[in-house]
């Protein structure tokens, strides 16, 4: 978040009046354009921070419904089969059918929630302009091209006027303008790549979550039919195994897809932004120090009168590094709190592993006992499988609920202290707009 400093302190004595006025006008245009480009990055960060303000509850609701449905199925299955291990014919199949219907309903709700997120993302990418990364990137690069042309025009103007070209102050000013340009581009680069990574990861996860819930619903439907046609049991358990495998892999695959897309975005942007490779904040501060040294040797009183304004605006640059770290840390933290249990790598591995175990136990026990009508031993295995289901779904419900509560507490705490990402960004935008107003007041 760049910026900026009032640099219109070129002495009229160094050049003819026309060249001086043209230089001041160019400085104003360059600085205001840099400010506007800086706000572009802030707006994209703000959109990322606010993006899931309400939609996160669709995630939470869908995942909780999905897990709750199978929790009901596991509890009823354990009750019916566990209490009738030695009397298999007393198992109430109608109760099991109703329980599996609950499981199907929950997974359908979960799949619908994730599908709705994909749909809303698609609609949002069409109608949203301000925070849409693709549109923002296109506009940023277009405006950056114009900024670079103005900087180049300024360099040519300075080079063609002997007085301007010999001024240490103006040379230092030019270095700082270049450094500010790189700082703004680097900020945009980091923001764009982060937002792209997060959005691609989310989209891939939603797609896989639709698949996870769909295969779970199919498995429940086939298992329901297998109560009356036992030879369908292997097919039902295979669907559960697929669902479990997707549950385990989804967070890893989605985060991997985001990182790959991020690398592509980084490579593409690095070429377009033409960054110097200097540590940007440190380079800006070094250029500012050099400019201040040049100011000390300046004899023109009109320039010295502008120095306090320079010092006030300098605070924006000097606070840039720490603020950028706080904002990015805040965005990452918000992303962490927004993750449901199925998006948490270790929680999803535990949950998916248990569903995978359910399918494996179900298939193995059917092949060994069920198809040979050794029902008592088969019931013991099925009871164990249902207990595993209860454990998995309870973990899913608990981990998702914990993430939701932690996120809401962090939001409430940040709102009270006015230290949320949104608050930091809003304050920064106001500061930049204030500096922009000061720049526009300067007359050559």
Feature locations, PLM:
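Classical Sec-dependent N-terminal signal peptides that target proteins to the secretory pathway
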Residues: 1-17
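Leu/Val/Ala/Ile-rich N-terminal alpha-helices, chiefly Sec-type signal peptides and the beginnings
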Residues: 16-111, 117, 124, 170-207, ...
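A structural signal for well-ordered alpha-helices, especially hydrophobic packing surfaces
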Residues: 69-72, 113-116, 120, 148-162, ...
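Surface-exposed, polar helix/loop patches in the mature regions of secreted/periplasmic/lumenal proteins
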Residues: 123-135
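Membrane-proximal, non-transmembrane alpha-helical segments
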Residues: 39-47, 170-200, 307-344, 348, ...
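Cytosolic/matrix-facing juxtamembrane and C-terminal tails of multi-pass cellular membrane proteins
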Residues: 19-33, 37, 133-160, 264-340, ...
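Interhelical loop segments of eukaryotic multi-pass membrane proteins
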Residues: 86-91, 133-137, 228-234, 270-271, ...
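Membrane-active amphipathic alpha-helices enriched in small hydrophobic residues
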Residues: 57-82, 98-126, 197-225, 235-264, ...
